[in-house]
Design a protein with these regions (language model features):
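Conserved active-site alpha-helix within GNAT-family acetyltransferase domains
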Residues: 117, 147, 171-188
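Conserved acyl-donor/pantetheine-binding loop and adjacent beta-alpha core of acyl/acetyltransferases
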Residues: 74-129, 194-197
């Protein structure tokens, strides 16, 4: 795709990041309270950003096409400046739970996070870097944008003398991309989501360089 720019993150990108998260992970399939969905999405994004030391964004004009968030062990760089007191209100810490249905839907989200913890349990010392969040918009897939973003992150990790990384993904995402880029699937865990009566496969992928 022509005219794509790969750049650092800006505060103005965060709303587009949220939209890409909702589209990629289909949170709205099992969280139907719109206010709750907003809080879950923004909290997930903030947590991912605050745990990262490197972010690269692909954009064309004013539109974000994709982004990658990474962490290398030992790098103290952070992006906390994106969340100043002036915009902290956009990232509430209290969930707007109104009824039992909301509680059940939150429980589904927690199940997925617990599955990721289970996948990594006992393996933490195998890795010195990770990809916290990596999304390319559906319209921009297959155009080399994901591969370019990944290469930026690998170059960064190499500069930090990292040797192995991990990431979590699941079958809502294009996990075949990681296989095509030389990643290995180290483990997988099935999660039953009662609200949609289906299983979600979660994966731990690794890469050594």
């Amino acid at each position: 795709m022509k005219d794509v720019i790969y750049r650092d993150v800006k505060k103005e990108d965060l709303c587009e990041f949220e939209n890409l998260i909702k589209d990629a992970f289909n949170f709205d399939k099992f969280i139907h309270n719109k206010e709750l969905l907003k809080v879950i999405t923004t909290s997930y994004l903030k947590e991912s950003i605050c745990e990262s030391s490197f972010i690269k964004v692909a954009s064309k004009g004013d539109k974000v096409l994709g982004f990658i968030l990474c962490k290398a062990h030992g790098d103290k760089a952070n992006y906390n400046h994106l969340f100043t007191p002036l915009n902290e209100g956009k990232y509430p810490t209290t969930l707007p739970i109104e009824n039992i249905k909301d509680e059940n839907e939150i429980a589904e989200f927690i199940k997925i996070k617990e599955a990721y913890s289970e996948l990594l349990n006992g393996k933490e010392n195998l890795f010195d870097s990770c990809i916290n969040l990596f999304i390319v918009s559906e319209e921009a897939r297959g155009l080399g944008i994901g591969k370019t973003l990944l290469n930026y992150s690998l170059k960064y990790m190499h500069s930090m003398k990292s040797s192995s990384l991990y990431l979590f993904t699941d079958d809502r995402c294009n996990y075949g991309f990681y296989k095509s880029q030389g990643f290995n699937c180290l483990d997988e865990v099935d999660v039953y989501l009662k609200t949609v009566d289906s299983n979600l496969k979660t994966f731990l992928y690794t890469y050594s360089y």
